[in-house]
Each structure stands twice: as C-alpha cells, then as structure tokens.
Amino acid sequence: MKEQTNWLIVGLGNPGREYEKTRHNAGFRAIDRIAEKLGVKIDKLKFQGLYAQVNTATGKLFLLKPQTYMNLSGRSVLQLSAFFKVPPARIIVLFDDISLEPGKLRLRKDGSAGGHNGIKSIIQELGSQDFPRVKIGVGAKPHPEYDLADWVLSTFSAQEEKFLAPAIDRAADAALCIMEKGIAEASNRYSGKA
C-alpha cells in the first residue's frame, strides 16, 4: 500500500469583513476558490485558524486561513502542520505580492520573505523557508511615498479586479498542480500573465 502523504495549502489574509476585498487578502480569496473547486467549506475553527480537511487518494489535504492577522500567520501554520505532521516541503502558501501587477502569478519553490510579513512569520515559526509559494500580483504602490500598510489594505479598482479575478482562479489551480505534478510543472503552466 502506498504511503499516505498529507498536504497543507495556506491562504494568507486578515480576518474580518472590512479586509475581505483588500490587496492583502488575495491569498484568502485564492484558498476560498480552491475550497469551491473541491466542494468543501473552510469552517473548522482550530489552530488559530479556519480550516477544511479533504481526503484524497494519496492522503489528506488541509486548507487553512489563519485568523491571527497577517503578521502572526506562522503560529496558525505551525500548529496545524505539527498536529497533522505536514513537513514544510508540502506546505503551499498563497499570498499577495506588490512587486507583480494584478493578474500576474509567480511560483517559488522556497526563499526568503521578500518583505512580506505573513511569509516572514511562517519562516520564523517553521524554522524553514523550504516551502512552495504562489504569489498573486496585487500591484505596486502608486508612488514611493505611499504608505505600504495603507496600500496593501486598500481595495482594487474595477480595472484591476478584471485582471485579478482570473488570476485568483489560476492561483487556485496552480496550488493544486504543485501538489499533483510538482513545482516545476506548475511554474511552467501558471507563472506569468493571466
């Protein structure tokens, strides 16, 4: 019998209705899309987050939305991954990236936080940066003096939303592809333009 492997897909964002449509919540939107595709609800409250469990042919897949606020996301990720014994290499994180324009995706096998506080928290808590990521472009600040926190907590223009909606869908597919086919194949298929 084939050994069972557990996977965890994490969408980063801030809890609360007022943050729902902000740039910083692109990860939440993408993981909600995965849940839709798999026909599950992310509604179990534990591990300082909301999660869902999906039984697959090869093991269990967990979908997690940390409810800690962005800067402490790693606490939730560590708790769930430790409990269900999911190693960093099988933790896929979906999150917003201001260095990419809306509609673009970038997949990474590992790496530093690149200035993203949610990723920084996960690296800190796991003690590893060896986890795959799907970065969702949310656009750069309009000018250098613009406050970063204000920017990531702002909402998308109607024009940006047109590019973002299909990118959210592709980010969901990309995360599932990493799990099924590996990061190289997923990068070939999904990195770049929507």
Language-model segments: which ranges?
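Nucleotide and nucleotide-moiety/phosphate-recognizing core
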Residues: M1-D110, K120-K135, K141-D147, S154, ...
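Hydrophobic alpha-helical segments within soluble ligand-binding/sensing domains
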Residues: G115-G118
